[in-house]
Amino acid sequence: MSQSIEGLFAQTLARRHVLKLFGVGGIAALLSYSRLSKPQPTVFQRDRLELPTQVGKPTTAVVIGGGLAGLAAAYELSQRGVAVTLLERSPQLGGKIASWPIQVGEESFMMEHGFHGFFPQYYNLFSLVDELSIQQNFKSLDYYSLVYKDHYDPEVFRPSNSAFPWNIVDLAISSSNRLEWGINLTHLKHLQVFREITGFRNPQTYERLDQLSVTEWVGNDFPKGLYDLYFLPFAKSSLNSPDVLSAGELMQFFHFYFFGNPEGLAFNGTCQDMGRSLVDPMVEAIQANGGQVLTGVTVSQVAWQEGKVAGVTYQNGSVVVNPVPFWVDRNPLLSSETMEYFGAGDSVYSVAPGAKTALSLTCTHQGCSVQRQVTTTAEGYLCPCHGAAYASDGAVLAGPARENLATFEVLQREGDRIQLMAANVDGVPNVAHDLTADYYVMAADIPGIKALFSLSDGEVEPALVSQIDQLQVADPFAVGRFWLDRDFDWQHSWFTSLSGYRLTDSITLYHRIQDDYIAWGDRTGGSVVELHAYCYKEKDFPTQADILDTFEAELYEIVPELKGATVLHRQLVNQKNFAGFPPGSFANRPQTATAVNNLLFAGDWVRMPFPCGLMERAVSSGLLAANAILQREGVQRRPILSVNPEGVLKI
């Protein structure tokens, strides 16, 4: 095996370079690692004293946001006797793993925000799965493929019990692209790259690399094959584009998914939609412990008093039906002299020059963004997905939509943004409900957390406001799901990452994964294929029609057998709300605990004390928030698990 390592790291590697870069201790750590001994998860939080597991006095908490982070916090707190009230603005719980019904012809399906892989090193997420006894809701996808449009052979990742360096050895043995990597460890720059990707430490890695974007970091003599094969596709799978992603954050991401991960890159999917498979059992557990879960409610005020959160006020319904103001940024890519547009993705608003009202362009049929259509005889809006047509004032002209587009009052302008409020709500009864609690967990996404702080009444800690203001969302993502009248042969994994296409970053065969879709495929002989764009540039695809048309064109490139197939239905999800991790954002990123002793944050956007990503980051942040409350109440904290928090080659 030592010969394999020698061949991988270069036959002519100078001993003095290695010793200078890694030190004797680092080399000892590398060589002493045993392939036969799988590293066990690191326990991040474990109380040494035996403390009570339940709160000893009545304790209340309000959790704002019903995504994975908020659900995890509410679940753990409700298990410990805390009286929890969970508020969620959407009709569905789950955030980015929410599910909702759609109509496809005469049949109903559950739609999602795109396929999510449940990786085996999601230790905290799977600890909840075990406690809820819902292991049967997940299925292994056996292996994971990464397919390139040009030049390179596919890469295949399988389950593993080996961490670094043996997972690198295994990859070098299995990859037919290994001679394309372009690594030469006698080259100082390449040695430095190797040092960074194998020696992640927090905060030292961020101190070196957080001020650089990934694009900047790889722009100076970086191994091209290594970038094309692994860094580019995996960087985009963080849902952040390399040109606006911190290089330090990417090192954390790589450590969690590969260099510090002894489980391999094969993963599970859900047997049904993620709502039924994971979200619903979590909600049922919260409610079984007395928790109150409210959906379709909008927070209208956050009261502050004496440096603490004093309470929140909410109203029933979304922003469409209640008088809660909100801000939205101008979209320069869509705006013209004849019409201004604000927002992005599936939350876009049009404002005519000088108008005091705005029109929501969210189709009332199934949530797509309608497109402006101007002809010689009429002007209006058309849904690119299902053909619903609206007049210029938002009135329905043709189905399948049955309700008019929503209208909003323009309350004020501030630079390139406007403040809107639902119009025509004066006669609609909507009672404000006040909530007070001992603790508040804000677990909304970044647009949501910014909206909560904009609704503050009272004096807020300035440093906290600064932290929230600097948060940024990533470039938008898009998911196109296509129902077709024929099946096709596919030699790769049922979820496959793709690289080299203008828009598409992955393909998922739903008629091979989820039970309802499998049954439909068996019954009809058709297929259901999902294409996912993780972080596209709006200037390249300014409208949803552009996105759908490009998805469909690339589908026939990816699966030539589908040329000539009939598209029975196509469904689009297009949002701009994923957490951004731009250069320079690490130092001032909010953590779970705040300077306000009754306020906690949770979400995939918070600064974490150990490596984690995506769903595991959301769940872990929620459990950390719950632990902070439990600790303040003198209650046993939940042990939090992680991969090895530092790289083997510590620097």
Located regions from the model:
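N-terminal secretory signal peptides
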Residues: 1-14, 38-41
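N-terminal export leaders
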Residues: 14-23, 27, 31
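N-terminal Rossmann-like FAD-binding beta1-loop-alpha1 element of flavoenzymes
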Residues: 59-85
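Glycine-rich FAD pyrophosphate-binding loop
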Residues: 79-101
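Mobile amphipathic helical/loop "lid" adjacent to a hydrophobic cofactor/ligand pocket
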Residues: 125-126, 130-131, 136-251, 260
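Helical element adjacent to the flavin cofactor pocket in flavoenzyme catalytic cores
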Residues: 257-323, 414, 426-433
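N-terminal pre-ligand scaffold of iron-sulfur
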Residues: 318-377, 404-427
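C-terminal segments that line or cap access tunnels to active or ligand-binding sites in enzymes
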Residues: 437-439, 444-584, 589, 595-597, ...
